[in-house]
Structures are given as C-alpha cells and as structure tokens.
Regions:
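S-adenosyl-L-methionine-dependent nucleic acid methyltransferase catalytic domains
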Residues: 1-74, 83, 117-302
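Short, acidic Gly/Pro/Ser/Thr-rich loop/turn segments
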Residues: 100-102, 137-138
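Eukaryotic intrinsically disordered and solvent-exposed regulatory patches
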Residues: 80
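Conserved beta strand-loop-helix elements of the APE1-like EEP
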Residues: 83-101
C-alpha cells in the first residue's frame, strides 16, 4: 500500500507551490499476522516518506471520531492481559513545501485578510485534537465499492480555511465522492480532484451537479450566526470585543478579522464532460451576510 501512496506524495511535491501545504488524513491499522496481533503505524511511515521528499512536518492533528457503537472491545473483553485498546482516532498530518508563503503585493495581502477566520474559530481549529463525528456511507450505485469511508465535510472545510486563501486551487488526489471539492466551493476556492475508480464518475457528477444551494449557503450563515452568539456571550460577561467588521456588520476580537468577508453561492454548473468533469461556481458578490432571507437559513454541520 505505502509503495503506491509514495507515488502520490511524490506527485504532490511536484505540483505544489512553494509555501503550500499537504494535509493527509490517515488511520493506523491493526492486523493479525501469523497469529500475532499488532499495530501498524501508517502515520509514521507517511511522515518518513514525505520528509524524505523534502516536506516539513508541522504539528499534526488527532481526529477523535465520536461514535455511538455499543461494543468497542477488542481482544479478551473483561479479562486482563489479552484485551487491546480500541483505535478511535485518525491522524491529520500537516506538511509544508519549503518556507512560509510570501505576500509581497498589496493585492496578495488584501486577499489574505479577506480570507481570515474568527478568533474563536482559530482557538478550535488550531487545537491538536478535533472531535468531529465520522461519516459512513453505503454506495449502492458504485459496484466497485461496498462502502465509501468519506470524512465529514467539516474536516476539509476547516483545513481549507486554515491552510489556503480565497482563489487558491485545492488538490485532492483521492476525490471519492467530492467532499473536498464541496468544501472548496463553500470556501471560495478552486479545486482539482483525481479518482481512479471510474465507476464513481456518474455518482460524483450527480452529487456535484445537484448541490443544494440553499443548504450549502446555510453553512455560511450558520458560521456567521455562531460568531454572533460568541460575541453576545462575551458582552453578557462584560468582556471586551474591540473591533468592528463593516463588511459583515459585526464585532470581532482582533484587527486581523476586520476585512473578513463571506459570499453566498449562486450556482454550480457542469461546464465540460468529455473525459473529465469540470464545474464552475458563481457567488453572489456584494450581498451582505445578514440580508439572507429567513427561509434560506439552516445548518449543514449536524
């Protein structure tokens, strides 16, 4: 497996720009071989491969996958010396190619500030432990796969906002059902995805061609609403919220947040279908966040 994955990391190194990030979601594995049960550290093997290519490994994230499974025991149950710890987390490995990204032009600096995130989001997103409910999807229309272990939308949404800025191109070498592509659309980024399972193409086309725009835009509003609740809570505690963001008409904690803007998705169109799927996203520019009609409001992160 890792010999094949090494080819992917090599291509990522080739195409990524200086200062760009590589984020890899991987779980460790347990196997019984020749009667011996053991842990196989996939994360360690991938770190070694990426560092050999020249990537710098930055602080990683542990994704603690909350579960309602009634039986999580491995091994001898209640008896000592034969039971094993159940793996309930996966790794999100963070790498950077080369030195920090530079911002020399005024337009580059403006885009970076426009792509900022809220102070309270940073406190959660840049923690090294994430608790996000996992996703398990059964695919009836893809004969080549009995199950697709998609990660939840919130995971790539966070990473894209943390390690890229608006207008950037996000590369997904394991496209699957397009979760990363959807997260990129919601974050006003472009994306390119590759998937070797050709039988997934019709389903992927259906998913990305029929995005529920109202539901997708509800994520943007929900993010804004969570911030308003955060501000209200601080005010009730007589804590200071010092700055104003005139673009989205709310108080913010730091000066770096004052240029943050949101734009709603207008439509997502399939523009090319010869040997690839090409989608174009349009946004409602200049529309204020709090002008959103009440019937469009909701939540996408459940």
């Amino acid at each position: 497996m890792h010999q094949e994955l090494d080819k992917v990391w090599t291509e990522c190194w080739r195409v990524l720009k200086e200062g760009a990030f590589l984020c890899i979601n991987i779980g460790d594995a347990t196997r019984t071989i020749a009667g011996e049960f053991a842990l196989y550290n996939n994360n360690t093997r991938i770190i070694q491969a990426c560092e050999k290519l020249g990537f710098t490994n930055l602080p990683n994230i542990l994704w603690k996958k909350t579960t309602n499974a009634p039986n999580k025991f491995m091994g001898s149950g209640m008896l000592p010396c034969g039971a094993y710890v159940t793996l309930e987390h996966e790794w999100i490995l963070i790498f950077r190619k080369g030195s920090k990204r530079s911002y020399k032009k005024a337009s580059e600096k403006d885009t970076r500030r426009d792509s900022s995130f809220f102070w309270e989001e940073r406190n959660v997103w840049f923690s090294d432990i994430w608790e996000i409910k996992g996703v398990k999807q059964t695919i009836d229309k893809a004969p080549s796969r009995e199950r697709n272990a998609s990660f939840p939308l919130e995971l790539p949404y966070r990473l894209i906002n943390m390690y890229s800025q608006k207008g950037d191109v996000v590369l997904d070498p394991f496209m699957g059902l397009g979760t990363t592509a959807l997260a990129a659309i919601l974050s006003e980024r472009n994306s390119v995805g590759f998937e070797i399972d050709k039988l997934l193409k019709p389903l992927l086309k259906k998913i990305l061609s029929s995005i529920d725009i109202v539901k997708a835009n509800s994520l943007i509003y929900d993010r804004y609403k969570r911030h308003l609740l955060f501000v209200d809570d601080r005010v009730k505690q007589n804590k200071e919220v010092k700055y104003d963001n005139d673009h989205i008409q709310c108080k913010v904690m730091t000066k770096q947040e004052t240029d943050l803007t949101f734009h709603y998705i207008k439509n997502v169109e399939l523009t090319n279908e010869i040997d690839k799927l090409e989608f174009k996203s349009n946004y409602l520019l200049g529309r204020r966040i709090n002008d959103m009609p009440i019937e469009e409001k909701g939540t996408l992160f459940e």
